Each structure stands twice: as structure tokens, then as C-alpha cells.
Amino acid sequence: MSSVKIANKQLGPGYPCYVIAEIGINHNGDIDLAKRLISVAVAAGCDAVKFQKRSVDVVYSAKELEQPRPNPFGDTNGDLKRGLEFGQEDYEEISNFCKQVKIDWFVSPWDEASVDFVEQFNPPVYKIASASLTDDALLQHVRKTGKPVIASTGMSTYAEIDHAIEVLGKENLILMHTTSTYPAKYEQLNLRAIPTMIERYGIPVGYSGHETGIPTTVAAAVLGACCVERHITMDRAMWGSDQAASLEPNGISRLVRDIRLCEQSMGDGVKRVYEEEIPVMKKLRRVGAAA
């Protein structure tokens, strides 16, 4: 199986797990909060941060946008969606800040115009959200950029995944196993799908987690996920639809730490007696006992 290069890092078998801190819309439309979250990801040792980009009037119908929905930005669903979108100056600030603190950044574009907008910043990769996996026009548009693609597969059948791969091609493609509920139930995470998908498709597979807690995402890395993604927040009690299923600063730090400890612990699979074990063996084993 070949690896996929994102920026200066290889993703695939034998390489460290690439950890993505999903900021998404947890910035609540506040660029200063977004930069604080980027700093949290850097301090934790994450490899990248990810945002979401939408052309609101393209992704949502006028009827959807007109729906009453009181929120910090106004009284309608449209006020909310527009309030959560960053524009040109915001993304310039994000791009410059990420360069300054040396962390990769990219987006999940929800429409073709958003791809065109983000291309000016030359992201190292694009992420296809699970909701967009069946959007052939978007997949084709993303593939035309020539950038690597990470495609999430939540709420998708094998037939739908197979078709997406036909559209995207396997070159420089990473699939992501995920369960699209927020927060996801542990019994529905189905982590064994990760090695199953690796065997079925012969390309790198990652994991996007929407569960609470840390151990299951670490388990995904141990099961072979080449990358993992978790939402981050300053405080799970903050306003916002994704905050409750996110990791706070201490949580994302522990996640990265535990994944790296597991990577150190895997070894090469050859059973051996380590030099440090010999004095313990001499002390604890009975003299004359069978080896």
C-alpha cells in the first residue's frame, strides 16, 4: 500500500498517525477564538487544524435560511449560518497565523465555490465531509485541484464509498471511517471497520471521531488509522452545536500523548528478552526451574 503525502508528512503504514484538530465552526464566528484554538492544537502536538467552508446561499435553500432560529447573530437560520462563516480577511489571518506557529491547516469545502475560494491559500489537502461523499460534482471539482483528498464515510454504504472512489480515483486518497452522530455511542463506533476498509480498498484509512472521551480514538490509531480527527473546544459548555462532542485543551493533549506512547510501544513484533529484564529474571526465577 502506498502512502499519501500531506505537506511534509507521509500518511500510511509505518508512519506516525497524523492528528487533526477539527475546529470546524467551534470558533463561533470569532477569529480570536479561532486563533486560541489553533494555539491549543499546536501546544497539544497536533499536525493540523481543520475548518469548514460553505457558500451559505448555495448550500442552503432560501426556505431553510428563512426558518426562525434565535441565535447570537439574529433570529433566523440564515443569520446563524452567515454568522459562522469566515471571509477573506479571516482566512488570511488564519493562514498567516498557522504559518507562524507551524501547523498545517485545511478545510472541508461544502461546495465548488468554497474550493475555489480556499485554493488561493494553497492548502496541503482537502477533506470531503461525510454529508458530501455522494456529491459527485464537488468530488470532481476537488480532485481537479490535484491536492490529496481525505474523504469521510459516515452514513455511507460500501456502494456509495465504491462510487466515490470511482469519481476521486485511489491516487492520493485517504478514506476516513466515522459514525455521523453527535456525540456517537460507543457501541456504534465499529472500529473494526478500519482494518476491514484497509483490506477492502488497499489505501490508507483514518478515523474521524464524534464520541466523548479519548480511549476509542487511541484504539483507532492502534487498529491502523493513518490519521485521526477530533473536534476541539475551549469548553464543552460553550454555545454551539458541536461543542459537546469536542475535546477540551487537556483532552486533545492527552489524545496526542497517548497515541504517541502507543506508537512507541508497538515494537517490531519479534519476541525477545531485553537486557533490562535479565537482572529481574535472575532475581525472581527459581533456581533450576524449567525455562
Segments from the language model and where they lie:
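Catalytic cores and adjacent flexible loops of soluble metabolic enzymes
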Residues: 1-291
